[in-house]
Swiss-Prot record:
It comes from Lactococcus lactis subsp. cremoris (strain SK11). It is found in: Cytoplasm. Its main location: cytoplasm. One of its GO terms (cellular component) is cytoplasm. Keywords: Chaperone, Cytoplasm. Heptamer of 7 subunits arranged in a ring. Interacts with the chaperonin GroEL. Together with the chaperonin GroEL, plays an essential role in assisting protein folding. The GroEL-GroES system forms a nano-cage that allows encapsulation of the non-native substrate proteins and provides a physical environment optimized to promote and accelerate protein folding. GroES binds to the apical surface of the GroEL ring, thereby capping the opening of the GroEL channel. It comes from the Bacteria. SUPFAM superfamilies: GroES-like (SSF50129). This is Co-chaperonin GroES. One of its GO terms (molecular function) is unfolded protein binding. The gene is groES.
Amino acid sequence: MLKPLENRVVLRVKEEEEKSMGGIVLTSASQEKPQTAEVIAVGEGKTTNHGTLISPLVKVGDTVIFEKFSGTTVKMDGEEFLILKDSDLLAIVE
């Protein structure tokens, strides 16, 4: 399993619908990049210059919305994950 460093999180991106609202099947080039994902792993946080640890606000299992073109995609054990900084997360879905 992946263990993110500092203030990074590992996400499993949720698959988006591959059809338009009119029922037309979209090619991968015309599809919007998904922005919703499940948090799989969370780093310990970032340490400030004064030595204070700032922990990420998300936890494993949270569903989050993230910035569209952020992060690094990684394949592991046949699955695709996204690693990004917690500052690239926009919201937690409740």
